[in-house]
UniProtKB/Swiss-Prot annotation:
Catalyzes the ATP- as well as the pyrophosphate-dependent phosphorylation of a specific serine residue in HPr, a phosphocarrier protein of the phosphoenolpyruvate-dependent sugar phosphotransferase system (PTS). HprK/P also catalyzes the pyrophosphate-producing, inorganic phosphate-dependent dephosphorylation (phosphorolysis) of seryl-phosphorylated HPr (P-Ser-HPr). It catalyses: [HPr protein]-L-serine + ATP = [HPr protein]-O-phospho-L-serine + ADP + H(+); [HPr protein]-O-phospho-L-serine + phosphate + H(+) = [HPr protein]-L-serine + diphosphate. It is an enzyme of class 2 (transferase). Keywords: ATP-binding, Kinase, Magnesium, Metal-binding, Multifunctional enzyme, Nucleotide-binding, Serine/threonine-protein kinase, Transferase. The gene is hprK. Residues 209-218 are annotated as: Important for the catalytic mechanism of both phosphorylation and dephosphorylation. This is HPr kinase/phosphorylase. ATP binds at residues 161-168. HAMAP family: HPr_kinase.
Length: 322
């Protein structure tokens, strides 16, 4: 991942209002940030932001009341040694939190070394939590997929398939049935947690749906505010295909999944053919997926019922399948 754009200046600009940050000194070091190795070796955003810790120098160092009190109790010699060691390790920047006054020696050393030094009246714990959430979001794995991303019955569903199969027309039909549009054509996905992938629309395409013959439709203007969504968690991928009957599996015995940013996402395949009501089929697929998430597998229940029927000597289906 390119980390060159993640530096003290960008982090300050994005969080100054939320965290009430003030840039005290070290403005010349605005380009300081994280190396690619530091980001690659970090197991989570907790490795990139934390309380003052000289063992982990390559992270954002936050000094709260406890750290400042500890500093004040040290001898002049120990203070000088600790400050020199901290600055020599070249952290991206330092934050003095809790409204505490930054120690004069720390301010002087940050000025001389061009180390950015921020202050904030907010507590150290609040600053760390907020910066960790921010770092986890901007450093999360990302991907852009082609398709129509919708909110169907509260579930994020991505319609995919070759061009010309009618994905946008199907999306328009589903929107007219009360479902919501997240994005059309290009969908930005980001893995924000260990068990979910979130999809959003690029700002340029916000609220727009392209339909052949009609051009660009502003879904928010046509259908109202409730017809669009800002983001949704991806739970199901519906792939539209056009195949001969002999190549289409009517009853897949195993659940199908697609890997999206390292997370398996449920997938169903729907054949496009004349006379098929695709909107109803997609809604049924979503309802069935919801049941599966609740532990209800209709196909497996049927197979168990069939097996018991064949084992029953009084059953009207004696014998076994061949």
């Amino acid at each position: 991942m390119d980390t060159s754009s993640i530096n003290a200046q960008s982090i300050f600009d994005d969080n100054a209002a939320t965290l009430k940050l003030s840039w005290l000194t070290g403005h010349e070091g605005w380009e300081r940030g994280f190396s690619a190795d530091t980001v690659a070796n970090a197991t989570s955003s907790a490795d990139l932001v934390g309380h003052l810790n000289l063992i982990h120098p390559n992270r954002i160092q936050v000094l709260g009341e406890a750290e400042i009190d500890y500093y004040q109790r040290q001898t002049d010699e120990d203070r000088s040694r600790h400050m020199a060691e901290l600055i020599a390790l070249e952290p991206p920047f330092l934050v003095v939190a809790g409204g505490a006054a930054a120690p004069p020696e720390l301010v002087l050393r940050c000025t001389r070394s061009s180390t950015p030094l921020f202050t904030t009246p907010m507590s150290a714990a609040a600053v760390i939590d907020s910066l960790r959430l921010y770092m986890s979001r901007i450093l999360a794995p990302r991907a852009t997929l082609h398709g129509v991303f919708l909110d169907i019955l509260g579930m994020g569903v991505l319609l995919t398939g070759d061009s010309g199969l009618g994905k946008s027309e199907l999306g328009l039909e589903l929107i007219s049935r009360g479902h919501g549009l997240v994005a059309d054509d290009a969908v930005d996905f980001v893995r924000l947690g260990p068990d979910f992938v979130e999809g959003r629309c690029p700002p340029l395409l916000q609220n727009l749906l392209e339909v052949r013959g009609l051009g660009l439709l502003d879904i928010k203007t046509i259908f109202g505010e409730t017809a669009v969504r800002r983001k949704m968690k991806l739970k199901l991928i519906v792939q539209l295909v056009r195949r001969p009957d002999g190549e289409f599996q009517r009853l897949p015995l195993e659940s199908q999944t697609v890997d999206v940013l390292g997370l398996p996402i449920s997938k169903v395949t729907i054949q496009v053919a004349a006379g098929r009501n695709l909107a109803v089929l997609v809604e049924a697929a979503v309802r069935n997926t919801i049941l599966q998430l609740r532990g209800i597998d209709t196909l497996r229940d049927f197979m168990d019922r069939q097996r018991l029927a064949m084992q029953d000597p009084e059953s009207q289906f004696p014998g076994k399948l061949v």
